[in-house]
């Protein structure tokens, strides 16, 4: 089933979260852990699978509480984007490598 297009009319449940918004969400989740003095592995890199796992679990457990508010949409419930977030949390390459992989896959057959 193709993703729904975002109408930006409030409670958005379509695939309109950008990667940078998701990265900002990850940073805010880590900042929340720091604020509550849960500082174990908060400096871990996403590719450090063992150390970052605790942060991933925190993000997964709290997806229902996260909301992204921007000028595009008044409230985008993050839990509705759980598949995309799970995919991003599962990437085991740096983003530059992942970008090159996706671009080469998409543009393998040039049509122009």
Curated annotation (Swiss-Prot):
GO biological process: DNA replication; regulation of DNA-templated transcription; viral DNA genome replication
Subcellular location: Host nucleus
Signal peptide feature range: none
Region (Dimer 1 domain): 42-61
Residues covered by region (Dimer 2 domain): 72-101
UniProt GO cellular component terms: host cell nucleus
A Pfam family the protein falls into: Baculo_LEF-11
Family indicated by similarity: Belongs to the baculoviridae LEF-11 family.
Subunit structure: Homooligomer.
Biological function: Plays an essential role in viral genome replication. Involved also in late/very late gene activation.
Name this polypeptide is given: Late expression factor 11
Upper classification of the organism: Viruses, Viruses incertae sedis, Naldaviricetes, Lefavirales, Baculoviridae
């Amino acid at each position: 089933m193709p993703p729904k297009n975002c109408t930006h009319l409030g409670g958005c449940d379509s695939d309109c979260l950008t990667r940078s918004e998701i990265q900002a969400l990850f940073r805010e989740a880590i900042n929340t852990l720091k604020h509550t003095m849960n500082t174990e592995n908060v400096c871990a890199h996403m590719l450090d699978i063992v150390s970052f796992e605790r942060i991933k679990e925190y993000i997964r457990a709290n997806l229902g509480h996260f909301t992204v508010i921007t000028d595009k949409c008044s409230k985008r419930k993050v839990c509705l984007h759980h598949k995309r977030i799970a995919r991003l949390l599962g990437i085991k390459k740096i983003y530059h490598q992942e970008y090159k992989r996706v671009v080469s896959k998409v543009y393998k057959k040039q049509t122009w």
